[in-house]
Amino acid sequence: MKAVHRLGIGAAVLVILLDQISKPLMRDWLAGGDIYVAPFFNLVSAWNQGVGFSLMTMRGTSGPYVLSGVAIVISIGLFIWLLRSHRVLPVIGLGLAIGGALGNVIDRLSHGAVFDFLQFHAAGYYFPAFNLADSALTIGVGLLVIDGLFEGRGRSKTPATPEGQS
């Protein structure tokens, strides 16, 4: 395994560890109620039974297992992609995405829902609560998009021809 791959795997492990440490700490800290931090930011206690930002909420006993199964399959695909990539930016992005997805899978399988505690708001609009795993996943996908947009810059779009041939 190359150093670049260890970097991506390390990013995934770090995200999972930080996510799993932060969630119980925040659950305990927020037991007395939500905390106003700034005019645009609160710490809240919210359980999400769906995927990111409460999309695809699946209630019932099978919901967490279905969503977790999908997240695990996607994470396996992302891990294969990580092992096939040799550039730092996509490998870190993939590691962050994998760590974020698996951090939420752990919550979903152990609690039946994902604990969210970060909430931004402005002008009466409250962005759905999220957690460190969601943040890592979003940043990871953002890095993949940036890599996809700029990866070909500076390279010739036409195949090189040997000297003397046209």
Segments predicted by a language model, with ranges:
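Alpha-helical transmembrane bundles and membrane-interface segments of multipass inner-membrane proteins
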Residues: 1-166
